[in-house]
């Protein structure tokens, strides 16, 4: 993420602050784009700056063949209308998370044959409302956080992603999957 900037220390938090701080103490920077390299140069960063492309996507394709198709309670992922939902960001806590839950319930009501896979963040601020809302819904598969290969396997087999994750916003389109970003 060298050189990626939103120019708002609070958004995303804490990622933007972390990127800026790390760029000041690092001597080697792997920028994904020329624009990112220019951001580093314009902010007075010293050290070697290499434009390398997106290492997240490199890792995705390096691991694609090893990706597992997780067994979600006997559900065959490729035969379902499957939506992968991932939500965890601070900006979505509280009322925003309740709005997301409301929207997911609308989808489930309208499209009764749709399944949702929802890995739950460990933070109880996110986890508890999801459990309360979906623990008894047979069309929602609540899981613990996925390891990387299971994550890739789930992305490969879903029809759509709904997420506030910056990483998933990059990975899913690289696999030809549509993404609805759950952020302001």
What are these regions (language model features)?
Residues 1-4, 53, 84-87, 119, ...:
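Short beta-strands and strand-loop turn motifs
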Residues 1-13:
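A short, histidine- and acid-enriched strand-loop-helix "catalytic/donor-clamping" loop
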Residues 2-5, 34, 184:
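Short, ordered loop/turn segments at secondary-structure junctions
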Residues 67-157:
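Donor-nucleotide binding loops and adjacent catalytic segments primarily
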Residues 29, 151-184:
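A donor-sugar binding/catalytic signature common to diverse glycosyltransferases
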Residues 10-22:
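Active-site loop-to-helix "anion-binding N-cap" substructures in soluble metabolic enzymes
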Residues 30, 50, 117, 141-143, ...:
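Hydrophobic/aromatic beta-strand patches that form the interior of the parallel beta-sheet core
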Residues 22-96:
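A nucleotide-sugar donor-handling region in carbohydrate enzymes
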